[in-house]
Amino acid sequence: MRTATIKRKTKETDIEVTVDLDGTGVANAATGIGFFDHMLDLLAKHSRIDLTVKAVGDLHVDFHHTTEDVGIALGQAVKQALGNMAGITRYATVLMPMDETLTRVVIDVSGRPFLVFKADFPRDKIGEFDTELVREWFQAFAMNAGVTLHVETLYGENSHHIAESCFKGLARALRAAVAIDPKTAGEVPSTKGQLGG
């Protein structure tokens, strides 16, 4: 089974994340940040990854530490659940519309972490959530999941729609890239015979 649980505790946050890559998209996100929970719910639903996130953070300071640390823990959980990545599809490209917004997400589950993130938010906040934290979350996730990730909003006018298209695009890209490819017969999808090195 491709599952993992990661616990992360610092002076700023106390987080537990569980993933099942072969789930049905069931989400149970409780971070204390309503908009962020909504994004995590979308991520689970559209990736078909079962996801449980329990986070207690220093929200009296701001949402930064909780958002970033959930990205770290979720990335680590996905990486651990993938194991040696044998048999996965590895690559995926998604164009994700959300009303007037269109975002392109391209992923390589390579073991080599990298992020390109290009999205301009017309507002500084979505409710009480700082829009700059969207990039912070993607950075933390990509670096800890060990994926090369390109996220680019091609156009959009509504900050909520832009954020949602980024998370949904990642979800659909993850869904395709971590899927088992029956044609590879359990081989690691690399001419080197391994990923991440």
From Swiss-Prot:
Reaction(s) catalysed (UniProt annotation): D-erythro-1-(imidazol-4-yl)glycerol 3-phosphate = 3-(imidazol-4-yl)-2-oxopropyl phosphate + H2O
GO cellular component terms, semicolon-separated: cytoplasm
Listed Gene3D superfamilies: Imidazole glycerol phosphate dehydratase, domain 1
Pathway assigned to this chain's UniProt record: Amino-acid biosynthesis; L-histidine biosynthesis; L-histidine from 5-phospho-alpha-D-ribose 1-diphosphate: step 6/9
Keywords from the named record: Amino-acid biosynthesis, Cytoplasm, Histidine biosynthesis, Lyase
SUPFAM superfamilies for the chain: Ribosomal protein S5 domain 2-like
Keyword Cell membrane found: no
Transmembrane segments: none
Superkingdom of the source species: Bacteria
GO biological process terms, semicolon-separated: L-histidine biosynthetic process
InterPro entries: IGPD_sf, ImidazoleglycerolP_deHydtase, ImidazoleglycerP_deHydtase_CS, Ribosomal_Su5_D2-typ_SF
Major location category of this protein: cytoplasm
Localization, UniProt: Cytoplasm
GO molecular function: imidazoleglycerol-phosphate dehydratase activity
Enzyme Commission number(s) of this protein: 4.2.1.19
Matching Pfam families: IGPD
PANTHER family: IMIDAZOLEGLYCEROL-PHOSPHATE DEHYDRATASE, IMIDAZOLEGLYCEROL-PHOSPHATE DEHYDRATASE HIS7
Family in the record: Belongs to the imidazoleglycerol-phosphate dehydratase family.
Protein name per UniProt: Imidazoleglycerol-phosphate dehydratase
Native source organism of the sequence: Rhodopseudomonas palustris (strain TIE-1)
